[in-house]
Amino acid sequence: MAEEISDLHDVRNIGIMAHIDAGKTTTTERILFYTGKNYKIGETHDGASTMDFMAQEQERGITIQSAATTCFWSRQSHDTKDKFQINIIDTPGHVDFTAEVERSLRVLDGAVAVFDGKEGVEPQSETVWRQADKYGVPRICFINKMDKLGANFYYSVDTIKEKLGATPIVMQLPIGSENDFTGVVDLVEMQAYVWNGTEELGAKYDTTEIPDDLKDKAQEYHEKLVEAAAEADDDLMNKFFEDGDLSKEDIRAGVRKLTIAKEAFPIFCGSAFKDKGVQPMLDGVVDYLPSPEDVPAIKGYKPGDESVEIDRHPVKSDPFAALVFKISTHPFYGKLVFVRVYSGSVVPGDSVLDSTREKKERIGKIFQMHADKENPMDRADAGNIYTFVGLKNVTTGDTLCAIDDPITLDSMTFPDPVIQVAVEPKTKADQEKMGIALSKLAEEDPTFQVTTDEESGQTLIAGMGELQLDIIVDRMRREFKVECNQGKPQVAYRETIRKAVMDQGYTHKKQTGGSGQFAKVLMNFEPLDTTEGKTFEFENKVTGGHISAEFIGPIEAGVKEAMESGVLAGFPVVGVKATVTDGQMHPVDSSEMAFKLAGSMCFKEAAPKAKPVILEPIMKVEVRTPEEYMGEVIGDLNQRRGNIQSMTDGVGVKVIDAKVPLSEMFGYIGDLRSKTQGRAMFTMEMDSYDEVPKSVSEEIIKAQRGE
């Protein structure tokens, strides 16, 4: 069985988060090496990192899924006896995979935010920082790539203050920079750690005096650190006023208190790739990030009654409660369910309740994961992260709990997809497998959706960006052996009428020997307000028995059938109120079929006179952009026939709300990124259907007619 520490005080559940290419996965690889979890270092650029185990991750050098592992660490800078268990989740940095970050942060107690020492805070750094704010996750910061040309520690610290609105507490100063970066000054211990290159892979470093050229600066920053720590509580402030200084233990206690309260963020620095600075940062993880005991009790509610609040504490004596934060598919074990256990404990073979779905589930096996390797466990206890096997109907965001003491924990919310692509299988064999593959992939990723277009019959896959959908198609090919073609889906246009046509008559009469066909109808067709979601209304105003009741239904069915294909471009017609006012029937020749045909033809003859128009889907678009790009973003939205609704201030950004036709939004994600250097982000959702301008309408009609 895998090793596990029983005292929760010595457990840390952390995530590694950053903008893409800040060195997040490389930092994680060094952590695994120095903690003894890995015996060799896998490099991202070689496609060999432990945590990026998917083929697509190794080829592209990016993290796509959040991977979990557990390692152990004893401090090196002070108090070296205690051994800590660190459960780590390495999350993606690419904007297309923000859902992976979102669901990881939901179950973590703390995080390490990795920044590029040259760039400082980058766009996706801002995004993941806001996500961590949303879930109240305390963070320490690691300014990485201090060996990089142009690296500037002090600039990077300033960007954390200015762009994130955060309060940084500098815990270290770099010794040298770029090629001359050799180590760090510890501002608590007031000593230097230098990696001289004689020890392989930076596993050992020398503890020395602070270099002469840094002594004054180190003293200045030490005093700032002491003053910041003293702000943590009244006792520390009194000690500071009495003595003019604080002990090392008091400094750490004050910084820890501020960090857990999310009032400040300790700053460390190094170069993970050059094997410098990672061990002191690990000391910072155990010194300043919370244990499960430091986090408030998880709140939930009684299933079916949100007014009854329930607390669960991270102790084995409380009833079992866990949150499912990720699902993945294993070639041998099938569905792997990743959970954070908040209270109680379970063993393999136990039955639990999925309170979200009100279904019982049985736990087959319990693992702790090391990337894609499974380490068996004989139990799952409060405060830790595990993987369960054997659960059938569970999905991301579900609560698992004790059957006799049910609770439902707050789930997770994910953004709606912003881009969709049509896929079609290449062969009949692929067609049969494609449905299974897509349903499994959709189960793994909450932002990936699969739908079928009712008009075209196309299978549409939707997600957060083109890269995400490319990966999905690639995974279908590799993992499920499904070959498919990708295309662009057509916008789902509609038609409607703008003018009422009254007393439209139609007589259906056919005599071919034997019983004939006869039906006569008189109808009104009027525009119908569709804002309440109603697209069609039918009313019967026939009096005097001119049309038998049995024929009214077929008239309605005939009108509906005719509305499936509009007169302008063959799009479905919406927004029509049809009223049958009079008519005539024959005692022998009238039939349901005759009246259905009469209703259908009556609408077809009325529609051209009713001022038909084409409608297009209008999207509600929100763009968050740094102020310097606002003019360009607004100009671009106007060119896309957008209608700006409002402009407001967000945290360090401008928020633009607009309504834009869906047809103009294809490719927008790439254009927006290029116009704003990747610093803006947007979301969109369906708002309404609106009339297409005449010039655009003419182009659509020509395209539909193949002209």
From Swiss-Prot:
SUPFAM superfamilies: EF-G C-terminal domain-like (SSF54980), P-loop containing nucleoside triphosphate hydrolases (SSF52540), Ribosomal protein S5 domain 2-like (SSF54211), Translation proteins (SSF50447)
Keyword annotations from UniProtKB, A to Z: Cytoplasm, Elongation factor, GTP-binding, Nucleotide-binding, Protein biosynthesis
Protein name stated in the entry: Elongation factor G
Residue ranges of every copy of the tr-type G domain listed in the record: 9-293
Pfam families cross-referenced by the UniProt entry: EF-G_D2 (PF22042), EFG_C (PF00679), EFG_III (PF14492), EFG_IV (PF03764), GTP_EFTU (PF00009)
GO cellular component terms, A-Z: cytoplasm
Family according to the record: Belongs to the TRAFAC class translation factor GTPase superfamily. Classic translation factor GTPase family. EF-G/EF-2 subfamily.
Ligand binding (GTP): 18-25, 90-94, 144-147
